[in-house]
Each structure stands twice: as C-alpha cells, then as structure tokens.
C-alpha cells in the first residue's frame, strides 16, 4: 500500500514526514536539509526555483522571489492584512480575477494556492525520492485559527500539486499527536505554536490514545516574519539617521536587510550581542555606503515586545473557553522556530507558571504529527482518536446586519446544525442567505464565506415557506451546506457563490499548468544531467588524448578531436537528445583510444611481470653484522 505523507506547509519553512514502522520519520530534501524554505523564485530566463535554491538568489532577484505566501492564502485583496503585507514585500501583490490577493511574476498572475502547490510538489518529490515510489495522498497542516477560505485554499493547493488531501489538520493538534502518542497517563496540555507567520494556542486533554481539543485561539498574522520586519525597520531607520538615505525604497537593499535581520534574530537566541555588517548596501554621489551596527539581545527584545505580548491575549481566551486556569495545565509544549527565542520562553513560563517542555523539535514536530494522522487514516496506527474543534463561530446575517451564530467556536468537529428560514415578502420565490465566520457581533465585520441563493420557492404569503438549511463542518474544518423545503419535502439545489477562492475550472487549469511545469522541470533536469555527463566525458577523453594520443593514428586522433568539438558546440543548447547523440558519437570514435590505453596498460603489466621474474632468480645471502669499533 502506498504511503500517506504528512506535510507541514509553513510560512517560512516546510517539512515532510512519513511513518516508518511505529515512528514518524522526517525526510531530508535533495540538499540534505530536514526543512525546506517556503520560497519560490521566477528567474529572467523563465526558470522556476523552489526551496533553498530560490532563497539563495533572493538578494539578487528580490522582485522575482515569493516568500511567506501562506499569509495571503484565502485572503481578499482588500483585506487590511494584505494591505500591510504589500508595503513590506518586494514582490508584486495584485487583485485576482476572483477578488482574492494573488501575486504577479513575469506578467503572469499566480494564486497563493498555486505558489503553495509548487512548495508541496517539492515536498512530494522529496518523499518520493526517499520512498522510491509514487506518493499520491497526504495530510497537510494549517494554523488552528485558519478560517474556511484559508483551509479550502490549502486543500486546493494540494490538489494542484497532484495530491489527494486526506485530511487538513491543525498544527497544534498535529504537534500534540507527535508529543503524546506514547503517553498513557491523562494530561492537560497547552500547545504554544509561534511559527514564521502565524500564532496558535490550543488546549488539549490527552491520554490513552485520545486527543481531545478543548479550545483553540490565535492570530493568523503574527509570526517570525513580523519579528524580522521589526528589525528591518530598525536597521533602515538607524541608517537613515546616520547617512540620510532611506533604504525602504530600495528593494535590493531591503532584501539584504531582511536576510541580515533573520540571521541576527537567530544568533541572538544563543548570544547576548551580534554585529550586522552589510558592505555596499547603497551609494550616493560621495560614493558607496556600508551598514555596520551592533545589536544586543536586550535591544531586540524591546523592539519586538509588543509582538511577544500579542500572544498573551489568545492564551487567556483559550484557557477561558476551556474552563481552565493556567495552573491547571500540566505541560506547555513549544512549537515553531520562534519559540527558541529566550524572551518567548520567559513569557510562556511567567504566564503558565511552569517551565515549557522542550523535548520536541519545534521545526519538525508538526510534520511528524501529520504523518501520524496519515498512519491513523491508513490504519497503520491503531487506537488513536483525535477530536478537534472549529476555531471560529459559524452563522448567518439576520435583520439589521446582526451576526447570528449557528455553530459556536470550539465545537468538536465534525458537527452539523440545522436552522429553518422563511421569506420576508409575499410570493417571494428566492431567498439570499449570507454565511459568515468569525467572532464579531455585526456580520460585515466577520469573514463572508459564501452567499446562498435558494431559488424555486412556491408562491406563498411571507413567513409561510419553511426552508431548512443545514450547516455541516467536516473533519477538515471545511463548511458544507445543504437545503430542503420542509413543506414539499423537496431538496433544493443551492448555488454556492463563494466570496473568493478558486472554482473547479480554475483548479483544473492550475493542475494542468503544474503538470506542464513538472514536464518542463523534468526536461530541464534531463538537460542538466546530460550536460554534466557530456562535460565529464569531454574531460576524461581530453585527458586520455593527452596521455595516449601518440598511440593512435593521426586520422583517429583527428576524428576524436572533431567529435569533442561537435559535443562542445551543442552544450549551450537545450536539447538533451542532441547532446546524447554527440556523446554516443564521441564514445564510438574514442574506442581506438581506449584500445590503445589497454594495450599500453597490458604492456606495462608484462614488463613488471618480467622484472619480478628476474628478481625471483636472485639468491639472498646470509650475512653477519660485525661491530668493529676502533679504539
């Protein structure tokens, strides 16, 4: 049976794991790393890079390098968070045809789901390379506080990448699975997950294979990227004070600042001070300018203190919803790279009144949990029951624009709730129902999920028709809706007009685009491999020609040199078949050279044998050493 992989699709880094016997194993990528940067780059030559190769060239290609796209997924273009992001990233964020936030590269628009699919494809290839077989099914993680649109967009990304997404699982829940799989005694734990772009806090009761989420809360626009941008702003402001030049208008300089900020942030987790040194950051009429400054841990902590404090309110809300006090939490599990920051650990310790648990790898534990869930769904992992919750309330807009909740937040999923609606006017044959998700009291302050047009209602006085609408949240946290006319018993077909997202046709086109790109990538890889083989063949043939060229005729030598020249001439092209044909030709004409090499080698071996034979005829004489010292 083909394996189900677990993927942590992160804002900054992604990770893939698979069940290996009874344990989850993180798979190393082609660069030998256990995590892969969630970065996609589009070069001027039309090449597409994913992961570490994309991140490496970001400084020289800032506008063509897309990072932290998870913060855009499932969001509208006019979302205030998107507006904020537009001012911070060097790549272009544009309005998609459906009104969502998309990115534009080389005059082509890409949805965040497409960019995410490119990262997922990389993770899929990593797993396939390790397993030696095709991978078609996956469990993908999302922040617990993701809404329906963001979850659906993540599922779409999996489909575009050629994966059947068996389950969308919350990141803190996945971490709890990996942490508590071998724990038999009952415990109440809190998972504090501060990653590259999002923050989640979940409270769970675990024990004897049952993982029950009691509550969850969070902030989908708070993470390591925000800490980096705080430092970028600080560096740019200090440089402006010193040199009078604003680096915020220079995309190349901003990318260098971001790289330096990330490095400084990491270094300050283990040292009290670091030095930022960026030579030739910019130039003016007086010449090149260099940025050099020292940064202490204390200064960094003061710059990001408001970000750290923003994690406390969701923690309070999660505890309140779970009906618990901080002292009733048995263990606090830290997840996400940002939890390595000493200040974060200190704040968590102060809030919960206990040292946080550091026994799990914060970068890998989520992917491992996803792999375990994959094992559960496949039947390989027995006696594990996962009870998750919906993070946000689900409801409809009622008279006066009020948000009327049908399913409260932190309701265990899957769940179903029905509500009966009627008409507002006589002989009304259609009703429009607007479905929202969120916690605000007015509907328009929440996230519009979809608009339902119930058509074909029989003519009747207002308030008479009884239309039962059922809201259903599945195990992925994704909302489904059905409707029935109770008067006639007839099921009504609901035409869902999502407020954004991708249509089936969009996804189909993107799948085809991904497949064609996969074919292009395969062709490009074949070209590179063929060129590498050709260059190795040219090198070895030229070396042999230098050493043994005098052992073949001038005519043979001329043919070999001509074949080498022909092969070199096609190396600059993109036709691997032509390169292979020229390699074959060179191999054929070089046969006489190889023959000469073997003959020379055999002659040398025979000469050595004769010499050894001659040495065998020599008789060893006995001798006695006389120590004759003259006095």
From Swiss-Prot:
Expression induction or repression: By stress conditions e.g. heat shock.
Modified residues (Phosphothreonine): 198
Alphabetically ordered keywords of this record: ATP-binding, Chaperone, Nucleotide-binding, Phosphoprotein, Stress response
CDD domains referenced in this protein's UniProt entry, alphabetically: ASKHA_NBD_HSP70_HSPA9 (cd11733)
Signal peptide: none
Disulfide bonds: none
InterPro entries: ATPase_NBD, Chaperone_DnaK, Heat_shock_70_CS, HSP70_C_sf, HSP70_peptide-bd_sf, Hsp_70_fam
GO molecular function, one term: unfolded protein binding
Pfam families membership: HSP70
NCBIfam families: PRK00290.1, PRK05183.1, prok_dnaK
Function: Acts as a chaperone.
The family this protein is said to belong to: Belongs to the heat shock protein 70 family.
Protein name (database record): Chaperone protein DnaK
Protein encoded by which gene: dnaK
